[in-house]
């Protein structure tokens, strides 16, 4: 049907032959951009297709995908704004006088403007890069005609159609936030809308227990907003439970309230407020903003994957692909969050896209190693991790076959202001309980956790033992040294709190 609607007087063969490429990439997020740019560097003629379906509240954005526009970048900038505000409160302890704590107020509009100016600058940088690399960019929606032919519909008012073909097609369309199937769900927003709100969110209910929900709760609370998080199951599934406990307990000290054992039944508009009715004995409460952060769904609805023979997981809807990123039909590939059983991390998508292009256009055999990938949750006290959690290690090796070294510590920058956050800072190493003492996982809760874990992730990747850690001379004083100072095991029952400073 689509073929017949486009210039019927032109032969189909001519339409396709005039728009042939070596590679078509659908989706200009982190994975799609990485794959496109690498392929172009290797001499491929590349078509990159990307369009953003506006949110139910009308917000859309430029090239770069979730991370650059409504994910990692704006989120981390707002996290940094929260850190700056906290440091101001401790400045007088370090001799910085004249800061009137009563006059310190946060201006949401200033932050939002500056954050989104940075986002738009990134959009422009991406467009310049595509132009420099002679990548053919189409601001359009894509749909498969068959596995190597794509019909695109432009975002212009005429919705201009065109046809493209290539022997290699990469799908990298990512995920979008999920709206619940309840009355009034449309009255809520998602993280796709949060960073461009015209005014401060006010009293906010965040529904979800994953990293998006908790990170948003953290920085909004720091901006003096009344924040409640509804956690329907366990928070931060897949992360080490000891670490999650300290993150959650600390989050509560910042003023974030945590609702458990209830769900949202419906949302109603009451003037400018949102009246939320909870299940069971949860009652009814009014909020200024409701944020849905309980899961994400594949951004695939317009692609018509059946025409290409691309199989998806029946439960998640994600694309099934092998370790070489090959989908279920020859010539179609998938990278990034859209792939089943892959961690939803920007750096993984970038690496996957790059190595896929290498395999397609430079005879490379290298594939991504999905084990031992480090990640960070940017809650007020950050949580970083690489490798197995204690729970995963027990499940895989047995409780008697692993050893857990751990410590509570006080970050040096917390000493002078006597920052009470130190009571939640924690470090853990999980290793085998044999002569090798091979490190299975490293976990850190504290300030600058991402900066701490990155170097250890390199060491973890090449394989290190507990003795390697303990025989490493520390940099002192810093939080990172807590890993190399570890010596108390959980099994011993000794007090894991660090004592003293330089001895």
UniProtKB/Swiss-Prot annotation:
Principal location class: cytoplasm
EC number assigned by the record: 1.8.1.7
Record keyword Hydrolase present: no
GO CC annotation: cytoplasm; cytosol; mitochondrion
GO molecular function: flavin adenine dinucleotide binding; glutathione-disulfide reductase (NADPH) activity; thioredoxin-disulfide reductase (NADPH) activity
Cofactor: FAD
InterPro entries per record: FAD/NAD-bd_sf (IPR036188), FAD/NAD-binding_dom (IPR023753), FAD/NAD-linked_Rdtase_dimer_sf (IPR016156), GSHR/TRXR-like (IPR046952), Pyr_nuc-diS_OxRdtase (IPR001100), Pyr_nucl-diS_OxRdtase_dimer (IPR004099), Pyr_OxRdtase_I_AS (IPR012999), Thioredoxin/glutathione_Rdtase (IPR006338)
Cofactor note: Binds 1 FAD per subunit.
Claim: Transcription regulation is one of the keywords in the record: no
Domain of life: Eukaryota
UniProt-annotated catalytic positions: 476 (proton acceptor)
Binding-site residues for FAD, renumbered to this chain: 58-67
Coiled-coil positions: none
Biological process per Gene Ontology, one example term: cell redox homeostasis
Functional summary from the UniProt entry: Maintains high levels of reduced glutathione in the cytosol.
PANTHER family per the UniProt record, alphabetical: GLUTATHIONE REDUCTASE, THIOREDOXIN-DISULFIDE REDUCTASE
Protein name stated in the entry: Probable glutathione reductase 2
Organism: Caenorhabditis elegans
Source taxonomy: Eukaryota, Metazoa, Ecdysozoa, Nematoda, Chromadorea
Gene name, Swiss-Prot/TrEMBL: trxr-2
